[in-house]
């Protein structure tokens, strides 16, 4: 996510879309301004939405919250629409993705042990 792509989907961009558009986001939660998405759903400009990400997801998406009341009113409102599905960061969870994650992790461990450059090293 960059400053240029943050809230790429917003009130203005939604107003330029065809009526009844379907919005899918499996990238980054902050690509979509959630309140603008909700307004688009309410006024039927947006026909449906499929979201694997949410801009405030860290509080809700990484552990079981089924025994807890959602205190994020924006997320609760979003979940109230029958034409919205939120999959809580599950789109990545495929056999191929898990194999790639495991292979990358093992390669990084091997490279670290052998004092080779790490392809996925995050530097401060």
Give a label for each model feature.
Residues 1, 29:
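Short donor-sugar binding/catalytic loops of nucleotide-sugar-dependent glycosyltransferases
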Residues 3-23:
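Rossmann-fold NAD(P) dinucleotide-binding segment
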Residues 20, 30-124:
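Rossmann-like dinucleotide-binding domain for NAD(H)/NADP(H)
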